[in-house]
């Protein structure tokens, strides 16, 4: 019996069949735990008196957001801010951003003094690549059957790494899964089964949640300070 999280870690290549038990058939076997239904997954096994068969699969995928927000540039932000500030006042007030500052920012004459930063483009990449590889072997003799599978997953994120920095804040997740089903027939009526699934992995990433990073980017001022000093 495994959880839904463990079920996600079973390689698709290792699944032979699955079925769903509902209603009385589920509760009769699993009691209250089967009240919402039970999924039975049967993993692959080797066959007697067959030669070893090796299967290898390699996948690469590219993920890209379908829609991304468009942010106002620095000059547009400053003009809009001045208009909103004036709209809230009954009298004429001195704008926060003068015409000289707006013009200097628009010209890009000195990005350190007059920054104009697209924080979304600075922090996030347009897409990310993920990889998955699986190798499994199965076979058997007159008394022994075996099936073994090894899978490696590599997932990355959308965070950019600065060209002038050795630190990479992006998500870097490696996961390795091993599974085996070994059966040994002691007698015509007795069989010993060894079934094992093991997992090991490593994950690196920012301390902040991705949603927090998105939120900070949404509220970031494009003209407050430059990205690099």
Report the location of each language-model feature.
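Membrane-proximal, glycine/serine-rich, low-complexity loop/turn segments characteristic
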Residues: 1, 7, 13, 19, ...
